[in-house]
């Protein structure tokens, strides 16, 4: 049903051949008039009093009912390659009348999910407060193999002010996570991304327009002094990466290799298909640079001893 909508909108290459030996266009024509489809639609209408076209609505009908698309892809000086948030999962109570989530808050930086959860549960001076911007790094492909950090979003639900806390991370979320949770920040911290230069107490500005599906995450100040986005760009460029960035100690070697190849192939936002030419060029450039420094690898003898 979704593909029928996509075809109508001209968003599919319907001439592509499928596993059936037929084109996608032919398969969709078959499905549209199939007895099974007509039977399901009839069952919904007669027994459930449900309009089949309300189960998977067209974009036009969804807009008529006030529904918006689900995903926003914020960019900014903390996510130059991009990030993603399920904007419809933000509590409507914290949106302004234009449907925009706006927050400028103090950064609370964490390297491991367990440390972030410990701060959420804390009652002491290190606890998470309303308006804080939690920044979790080292959770991308090079850090943990792109782990899912659902435990943080679940823990925030138990805070009376959890909907006033923002989470930014280079890790990922499942579809279950709710709230102002921005993931897949790229480049990830361990790939040199600016998110790895954020410090405790920095001021971060988050804007997510849930209607127009636009957003940004930016460093805009430090030490309680608010500046602007251009200041943030300059500051992030001049700062060194944090010294405590590291991959998880139990990260398997094959995962580290995969993450390295992905980083050389465009990073988190480069897609799931390796750019072999780009990877080979990067490896060759590294080999040449190593040779120029005189760091030749020792020759390997093939003689038996």
Question: Locations of the language-model features?
Answer:
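Catalytic or ion-coupling anion/metal-binding cores of large enzyme and transporter domains
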Residues: 1-164, 168-305
């Amino acid at each position: 049903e979704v593909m029928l909508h996509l075809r109508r909108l001209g968003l599919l290459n319907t001439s592509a051949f499928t596993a059936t030996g037929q084109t996608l266009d032919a398969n969709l024509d078959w499905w549209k008039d199939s007895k099974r489809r007509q039977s399901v639609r009839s069952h919904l209408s007669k027994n459930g009093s449900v309009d089949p076209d309300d189960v998977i609505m067209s974009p036009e009908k969804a807009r008529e009912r006030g529904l918006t698309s689900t995903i926003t892809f914020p960019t900014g000086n903390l996510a130059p390659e991009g990030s993603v948030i399920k904007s419809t999962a933000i509590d409507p109570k914290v949106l302004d009348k234009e449907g925009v989530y706006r927050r400028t808050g103090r950064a609370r930086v964490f390297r491991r999910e367990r440390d972030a959860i410990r701060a959420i549960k804390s009652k002491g001076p290190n606890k998470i407060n309303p308006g804080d911007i939690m920044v979790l790094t080292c959770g991308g492909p090079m850090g943990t193999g792109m782990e899912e950090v659902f435990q943080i979003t679940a823990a925030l639900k138990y805070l009376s002010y959890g909907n006033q806390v923002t989470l930014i991370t280079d890790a990922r979320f499942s579809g279950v996570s709710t709230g102002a949770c921005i993931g897949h920040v790229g480049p990830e911290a361990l790939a040199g991304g600016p998110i790895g230069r954020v410090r405790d107490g920095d001021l971060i500005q988050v804007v997510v327009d849930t209607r127009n599906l636009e957003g940004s995450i930016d460093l805009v100040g430090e030490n309680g002094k608010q500046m602007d986005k251009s200041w943030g760009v300059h500051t992030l460029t001049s700062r060194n990466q944090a010294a405590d960035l590291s991959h998880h100690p139990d990260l398997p070697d094959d995962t580290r290799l995969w993450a390295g190849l992905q980083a050389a192939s465009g990073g988190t936002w480069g897609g799931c298909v390796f750019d072999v030419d780009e990877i080979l060029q990067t490896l060759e450039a590294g080999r040449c640079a190593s040779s120029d420094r005189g760091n030749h690898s020792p020759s390997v003898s093939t003689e038996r001893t």
